[in-house]
Amino acid sequence: MGVTKKPDLSDPVLRAKLAKGMGHNYYGEPAWPNDLLYIFPVCIFGTIACTVGLSVLEPVIVGEPANPFATPLEILPEWYFFPVFQILRTVPNKLLGVLLMAGVPVGLLTVPFIENVNKFQNPFRRPVATTVFLLGTVVAIWLGIGAALPIDTSLTLGLF
């Protein structure tokens, strides 16, 4: 399969690029014991210390207190569902909206197969996959911001 293809080291062009240091470097500092024993615990304990420290120093109420007898004016999903919520909200046909929502994971699954002929693992040498990723990220952020706005300005974000 193309995704798990190993570089052809008998290729003279590839060997010349590797000799110049242009290929992916499979060698270097070993993960054991350097990363696993020293760097990872520092990062993990540092993250835990920051989280506990911030929660002790600045205890705040998360959101508004719940009132089961009052329905909010607009019910919004969690922030990570904003882009697909915006798709469902703006597409007039619900079947098309569901198909577009199903297209999100299908599109994510196709990204590794876009440039499977490339022998390098450096993302700067895979311009098509990098462009698809960056464009998808910008569209997801655009839709996510638009989902928090009223429906009449949600697609343009009030800019146009």
UniProtKB/Swiss-Prot annotation:
GO process terms (BP): mitochondrial electron transport, ubiquinol to cytochrome c; photosynthetic electron transport chain
Topology relative to the membrane: Multi-pass membrane protein
Family matches, as NCBIfam families: cytb6_f_IV (TIGR01156)
UniProt family annotation: Belongs to the cytochrome b family. PetD subfamily.
UniProt xrefs under PANTHER family: CYTOCHROME B, CYTOCHROME B_B6 C-TERMINAL REGION PROFILE DOMAIN-CONTAINING PROTEIN
Protein name in the entry: Cytochrome b6-f complex subunit 4
Gene transcribed to yield this protein: petD
Superkingdom of origin organism: Eukaryota
One Pfam family recorded for the sequence: Cytochrom_B_C
Keywords on record: Chloroplast, Electron transport, Membrane, Photosynthesis, Plastid, Thylakoid, Transmembrane, Transmembrane helix, Transport
Location of this chain's protein in the cell: Plastid, Chloroplast thylakoid membrane
Role according to the record: Component of the cytochrome b6-f complex, which mediates electron transfer between photosystem II (PSII) and photosystem I (PSI), cyclic electron flow around PSI, and state transitions.
Transmembrane segments: 36-56, 95-115, 131-151
Subunit note: The 4 large subunits of the cytochrome b6-f complex are cytochrome b6, subunit IV (17 kDa polypeptide, petD), cytochrome f and the Rieske protein, while the 4 small subunits are petG, petL, petM and petN. The complex functions as a dimer.
Molecular function in Gene Ontology: electron transporter, transferring electrons within cytochrome b6/f complex of photosystem II activity; electron transporter, transferring electrons within the cyclic electron transport pathway of photosynthesis activity; ubiquinol-cytochrome-c reductase activity
One GO CC term, this protein: mitochondrion
